[in-house]
Amino acid sequence: MKKILVIDDHPAVMEGTKTILETDSNLSVDCLSPEPSEQFIKQHDFSSYDLILMDLNLGGEVNGMELSKQILQENPHCKIIVYTGYEVEDYFEEAIRAGLHGAISKTESKEKITQYIYHVLNGEILVDFAYFKQLMTQQKTKPAPSSQKEQDVLTPRECLILQEVEKGFTNQEIADALHLSKRSIEYSLTSIFNKLNVGSRTEAVLIAKSDGVL
């Protein structure tokens, strides 16, 4: 049984989504309305959920993208998908850069939403086609590997760490698996981010895949 959390400021939307998703007997869905409080993150155990569907426009002072970033700061292994009534393409790049696993429109069919969720649960990232084309275009304009600066090439250890990141493991879990300290993993991830010119684990995996590193 996979636990899903829907965060939205409209009770009808939350309950409707819960009803739709729970037609799948393998999904258990909870709903939560956000509060404009600094204690909101600490009051809830987001780590107990396998995936979070996050609305963007939560009303008042609460912004779904910022709330997602705060949750990921406290729970870096959380898998979050933007769940919005707006055009997905307008927010996809920001979501990926923030470390989220993609974006889904609320207007999608029940089957497609469920399919997207299972993709993410299986460790995959939902990549909008327009954004993927943009990524590939950027990669074509980069220097060939032979002309890259030596310090910009990922080390074998960094590649190994990135492979563990792709599997969805936390820094501590990666440290335990590789018999390294958590601090060492954090330093390595900072180096990876700088070399790939990215700001999140999700984006690092995407770029590494497009470069053939993973």
Curated annotation (Swiss-Prot):
One GO process term, biological-process aspect: regulation of DNA-templated transcription
InterPro entries: CheY-like_superfamily (IPR011006), Sig_transdc_resp-reg_C-effctor (IPR016032), Sig_transdc_resp-reg_receiver (IPR001789), Tscrpt_reg_LuxR_C (IPR000792), WalR-like (IPR039420), WH-like_DNA-bd_sf (IPR036388)
Post-translational modification: Phosphorylated by ComP.
4-aspartylphosphate PTM sites in chain numbering: D55
Domain HTH luxR-type: 147-212
UniProt keyword Iron-sulfur, yes or no: no
Keyword line: Activator, Competence, Cytoplasm, DNA-binding, Phosphoprotein, Transcription, Transcription regulation, Two-component regulatory system
DNA-binding segment(s): 171-190
Pfam families from the UniProt entry: GerE, Response_reg
Protein name: Transcriptional regulatory protein ComA
Originating species: Bacillus subtilis (strain 168)
